[in-house]
Amino acid sequence: MKNITDSFVSVGHWPSAGSFEFNTDILATNPINLSVVLGVLIFFGKGVLNDLLDKRKQRILSTIRNSEELRRGAIEQLERARVRLRKVEIEADEYRTNGYYEIEREKGNLINATCNSLERLENYKNETLFFEKQRAINKVRQEVLQQALQRALGTLNSCLNIEVHFRTISANIDILGSMEEITD
Protein backbone atom coordinates (compact mmCIF):
# COMPACT_ATOMS: atom_id res chain seq x y z
CA MET A 1 0.00 0.00 0.00
CA LYS A 2 2.83 2.26 0.77
CA ASN A 3 4.19 1.85 -2.77
CA ILE A 4 0.94 3.03 -4.26
CA THR A 5 0.84 6.11 -2.15
CA ASP A 6 4.49 6.76 -2.86
CA SER A 7 3.90 6.65 -6.57
CA PHE A 8 1.09 9.19 -6.31
CA VAL A 9 3.07 11.40 -4.01
CA SER A 10 6.07 11.36 -6.25
CA VAL A 11 4.11 12.68 -9.24
CA GLY A 12 5.81 16.00 -8.83
CA HIS A 13 9.20 14.41 -8.68
CA TRP A 14 10.71 13.46 -12.03
CA PRO A 15 13.83 11.46 -12.50
CA SER A 16 16.84 13.23 -13.84
CA ALA A 17 16.96 13.88 -17.51
CA GLY A 18 19.30 11.97 -19.72
CA SER A 19 18.58 8.53 -18.51
CA PHE A 20 15.92 6.18 -19.82
CA GLU A 21 14.88 3.25 -17.73
CA PHE A 22 12.07 0.74 -17.66
CA ASN A 23 10.29 0.63 -14.44
CA THR A 24 9.45 -3.01 -13.78
CA ASP A 25 7.42 -2.30 -10.73
CA ILE A 26 3.88 -2.25 -12.03
CA LEU A 27 2.48 -0.52 -8.99
CA ALA A 28 5.19 2.11 -9.19
CA THR A 29 4.58 2.97 -12.86
CA ASN A 30 2.82 6.02 -13.91
CA PRO A 31 -0.95 5.48 -14.24
CA ILE A 32 -1.04 7.95 -17.08
CA ASN A 33 1.49 5.93 -19.08
CA LEU A 34 -0.49 2.81 -18.41
CA SER A 35 -3.70 4.45 -19.48
CA VAL A 36 -2.04 5.74 -22.68
CA VAL A 37 -0.62 2.32 -23.52
CA LEU A 38 -3.92 0.65 -22.74
CA GLY A 39 -5.77 3.25 -24.83
CA VAL A 40 -3.43 2.69 -27.79
CA LEU A 41 -3.81 -1.07 -27.44
CA ILE A 42 -7.57 -0.81 -27.21
CA PHE A 43 -7.78 1.66 -30.11
CA PHE A 44 -5.59 -0.29 -32.53
CA GLY A 45 -6.27 -3.72 -31.10
CA LYS A 46 -9.99 -3.16 -31.26
CA GLY A 47 -9.93 -2.96 -35.10
CA VAL A 48 -7.63 -5.95 -35.41
CA LEU A 49 -9.65 -7.87 -32.87
CA ASN A 50 -12.91 -6.86 -34.60
CA ASP A 51 -11.47 -7.96 -37.97
CA LEU A 52 -10.37 -11.28 -36.49
CA LEU A 53 -13.73 -11.78 -34.81
CA ASP A 54 -15.63 -10.78 -37.99
CA LYS A 55 -13.56 -13.18 -40.10
CA ARG A 56 -14.09 -15.91 -37.54
CA LYS A 57 -17.82 -15.11 -37.44
CA GLN A 58 -18.02 -15.21 -41.26
CA ARG A 59 -16.18 -18.56 -41.35
CA ILE A 60 -18.50 -19.97 -38.72
CA LEU A 61 -21.58 -18.65 -40.55
CA SER A 62 -20.37 -20.01 -43.91
CA THR A 63 -19.61 -23.34 -42.27
CA ILE A 64 -23.11 -23.36 -40.78
CA ARG A 65 -24.62 -22.45 -44.18
CA ASN A 66 -22.58 -25.16 -45.90
CA SER A 67 -23.63 -27.63 -43.22
CA GLU A 68 -27.28 -26.63 -43.68
CA GLU A 69 -26.99 -27.03 -47.47
CA LEU A 70 -25.30 -30.39 -47.04
CA ARG A 71 -28.00 -31.41 -44.56
CA ARG A 72 -30.75 -30.34 -47.00
CA GLY A 73 -28.98 -32.19 -49.82
CA ALA A 74 -28.63 -35.28 -47.65
CA ILE A 75 -32.33 -35.08 -46.70
CA GLU A 76 -33.29 -34.75 -50.38
CA GLN A 77 -31.07 -37.70 -51.31
CA LEU A 78 -32.57 -39.69 -48.46
CA GLU A 79 -36.10 -38.90 -49.68
CA ARG A 80 -35.18 -39.82 -53.26
CA ALA A 81 -33.61 -43.04 -52.00
CA ARG A 82 -36.76 -43.80 -49.99
CA VAL A 83 -38.94 -43.15 -53.06
CA ARG A 84 -36.70 -45.40 -55.18
CA LEU A 85 -36.79 -48.04 -52.46
CA ARG A 86 -40.61 -47.93 -52.40
CA LYS A 87 -40.72 -48.21 -56.21
CA VAL A 88 -38.26 -51.10 -56.18
CA GLU A 89 -40.22 -52.86 -53.43
CA ILE A 90 -43.46 -52.39 -55.39
CA GLU A 91 -41.80 -53.70 -58.57
CA ALA A 92 -40.32 -56.62 -56.65
CA ASP A 93 -43.77 -57.47 -55.27
CA GLU A 94 -45.23 -57.22 -58.79
CA TYR A 95 -42.48 -59.43 -60.21
CA ARG A 96 -42.95 -61.88 -57.37
CA THR A 97 -46.73 -61.95 -57.86
CA ASN A 98 -46.44 -62.12 -61.65
CA GLY A 99 -43.75 -64.76 -61.27
CA TYR A 100 -46.02 -66.92 -59.13
CA TYR A 101 -48.87 -66.52 -61.61
CA GLU A 102 -46.50 -67.21 -64.50
CA ILE A 103 -45.16 -70.32 -62.77
CA GLU A 104 -48.69 -71.60 -62.10
CA ARG A 105 -49.73 -70.85 -65.69
CA GLU A 106 -46.64 -72.59 -67.10
CA LYS A 107 -47.24 -75.49 -64.75
CA GLY A 108 -50.83 -75.81 -66.03
CA ASN A 109 -49.65 -75.53 -69.64
CA LEU A 110 -47.01 -78.19 -69.03
CA ILE A 111 -49.55 -80.51 -67.41
CA ASN A 112 -51.98 -79.97 -70.32
CA ALA A 113 -49.24 -80.54 -72.89
CA THR A 114 -48.14 -83.70 -71.08
CA CYS A 115 -51.73 -84.98 -70.93
CA ASN A 116 -52.17 -84.25 -74.65
CA SER A 117 -48.90 -86.03 -75.44
CA LEU A 118 -49.93 -89.03 -73.35
CA GLU A 119 -53.31 -89.11 -75.09
CA ARG A 120 -51.66 -88.99 -78.53
CA LEU A 121 -49.24 -91.74 -77.49
CA GLU A 122 -52.17 -93.83 -76.27
CA ASN A 123 -53.93 -93.31 -79.63
CA TYR A 124 -50.75 -94.22 -81.54
CA LYS A 125 -50.39 -97.31 -79.37
CA ASN A 126 -53.99 -98.34 -80.01
CA GLU A 127 -53.63 -97.74 -83.76
CA THR A 128 -50.38 -99.71 -83.82
CA LEU A 129 -52.00 -102.56 -81.91
CA PHE A 130 -54.98 -102.52 -84.31
CA PHE A 131 -52.71 -102.59 -87.38
CA GLU A 132 -50.54 -105.33 -85.89
CA LYS A 133 -53.67 -107.32 -85.06
CA GLN A 134 -54.99 -106.87 -88.64
CA ARG A 135 -51.61 -107.87 -90.06
CA ALA A 136 -51.50 -110.96 -87.85
CA ILE A 137 -55.07 -111.87 -88.86
CA ASN A 138 -54.23 -111.41 -92.55
CA LYS A 139 -51.09 -113.51 -92.17
CA VAL A 140 -53.03 -116.28 -90.43
CA ARG A 141 -55.70 -116.11 -93.18
CA GLN A 142 -53.04 -116.40 -95.87
CA GLU A 143 -51.44 -119.35 -94.14
CA VAL A 144 -54.83 -121.05 -93.60
CA LEU A 145 -55.79 -120.40 -97.23
CA GLN A 146 -52.45 -121.68 -98.46
CA GLN A 147 -52.74 -124.80 -96.31
CA ALA A 148 -56.34 -125.33 -97.52
CA LEU A 149 -55.21 -124.97 -101.13
CA GLN A 150 -52.37 -127.38 -100.58
CA ARG A 151 -54.74 -129.91 -99.01
CA ALA A 152 -57.24 -129.44 -101.81
CA LEU A 153 -54.49 -129.93 -104.39
CA GLY A 154 -53.28 -132.94 -102.49
CA THR A 155 -56.81 -134.34 -102.32
CA LEU A 156 -57.42 -133.62 -105.98
CA ASN A 157 -54.13 -135.11 -106.99
CA SER A 158 -54.77 -138.22 -104.95
CA CYS A 159 -58.37 -138.57 -106.18
CA LEU A 160 -57.70 -137.83 -109.80
CA ASN A 161 -56.13 -140.47 -111.83
CA ILE A 162 -55.73 -140.45 -115.56
CA GLU A 163 -59.12 -142.01 -116.28
CA VAL A 164 -61.01 -139.48 -114.09
CA HIS A 165 -58.94 -136.76 -115.63
CA PHE A 166 -59.92 -137.74 -119.15
CA ARG A 167 -63.60 -138.00 -118.20
CA THR A 168 -63.51 -134.50 -116.64
CA ILE A 169 -61.86 -133.05 -119.72
CA SER A 170 -64.41 -134.78 -122.00
CA ALA A 171 -67.30 -133.52 -119.90
CA ASN A 172 -65.94 -129.97 -120.02
CA ILE A 173 -65.48 -130.21 -123.78
CA ASP A 174 -69.09 -131.40 -124.16
CA ILE A 175 -70.28 -128.47 -122.01
CA LEU A 176 -68.31 -126.01 -124.12
CA GLY A 177 -69.62 -127.59 -127.31
CA SER A 178 -73.21 -127.29 -126.18
CA MET A 179 -72.57 -123.64 -125.27
CA GLU A 180 -71.35 -123.00 -128.78
CA GLU A 181 -74.51 -124.49 -130.26
CA ILE A 182 -76.62 -122.26 -128.06
CA THR A 183 -74.78 -119.13 -129.09
CA ASP A 184 -75.01 -120.02 -132.84
UniProtKB/Swiss-Prot annotation:
GO terms for molecular function: proton-transporting ATP synthase activity, rotational mechanism. Keywords: ATP synthesis, CF(0), Chloroplast, Hydrogen ion transport, Ion transport, Membrane, Plastid, Thylakoid, Transmembrane, Transmembrane helix, Transport. It is found in: Plastid, Chloroplast thylakoid membrane. It comes from the Eukaryota. Pfam families: ATP-synt_B. It is a single-pass membrane protein. GO terms for cellular component: chloroplast thylakoid membrane; proton-transporting ATP synthase complex. The chain crosses the membrane at residues 27-49. InterPro entries: ATP_synth_b/b'su_bac/chlpt (IPR002146). F(1)F(0) ATP synthase produces ATP from ADP in the presence of a proton or sodium gradient. F-type ATPases consist of two structural domains, F(1) containing the extramembraneous catalytic core and F(0) containing the membrane proton channel, linked together by a central stalk and a peripheral stalk. During catalysis, ATP synthesis in the catalytic domain of F(1) is coupled via a rotary mechanism of the central stalk subunits to proton translocation. F-type ATPases have 2 components, F(1) - the catalytic core - and F(0) - the membrane proton channel. F(1) has five subunits: alpha(3), beta(3), gamma(1), delta(1), epsilon(1). F(0) has four main subunits: a(1), b(1), b'(1) and c(10-14). The alpha and beta chains form an alternating ring which encloses part of the gamma chain. F(1) is attached to F(0) by a central stalk formed by the gamma and epsilon chains, while a peripheral stalk is formed by the delta, b and b' chains. Belongs to the ATPase B chain family. In plastids the F-type ATPase is also known as CF(1)CF(0). This is ATP synthase subunit b, chloroplastic. The gene is atpF.
